[in-house]
């Protein structure tokens, strides 16, 4: 696949320094905090987090997307280093575009040659795309804690074509604390239906403090 240069849509001024860690990721409060943490973490993220902490949520999101008929041109939201796209491509042929708030994470993702193109975006604002562009939208690990709340889901539906599919994960505690299901119900009349599934975020052999954390996989048929 041809990988285009990152499209610059946001420049942030960074604040306090963040040491890369899962707890600091859970403690993020603002877009700038997010940019700073993941800029520092990008080069070692795959080893430090995905492998060492037995993160497996991206596999579950990919499986649900495919089982529900996901296909075509896909937007990977909060793509990070590309783990979800890699999981999808193990299950079939997709054309995938990436967006993330972190330029450094997208650089790592681009190096894997799995995306058609990538661009920067902030989910607390509009995704810089017109309506009804993608056949599907996926996201793994972006709706965790911190600044990305349930209102951002409307943007994911907006850029998805009628008849398309949105499959995202939301940390279970975040889902409950911010009442994500209430937000889903608000726009439910504008979509065909949605389903919820609770799954483990980490592997059975993980031993860290968050090893028992769960996530809700939300699948919306637009």
Regions found by a protein language model. Give the residues of each.
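A short acidic, Gly/Pro-enriched loop at the edge of an enzyme's catalytic core
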Residues: 127-137
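Class I S-adenosyl-L-methionine
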Residues: 192-222
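A short beta-strand submotif of the Rossmann-like class I SAM-dependent methyltransferase core
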Residues: 139-142
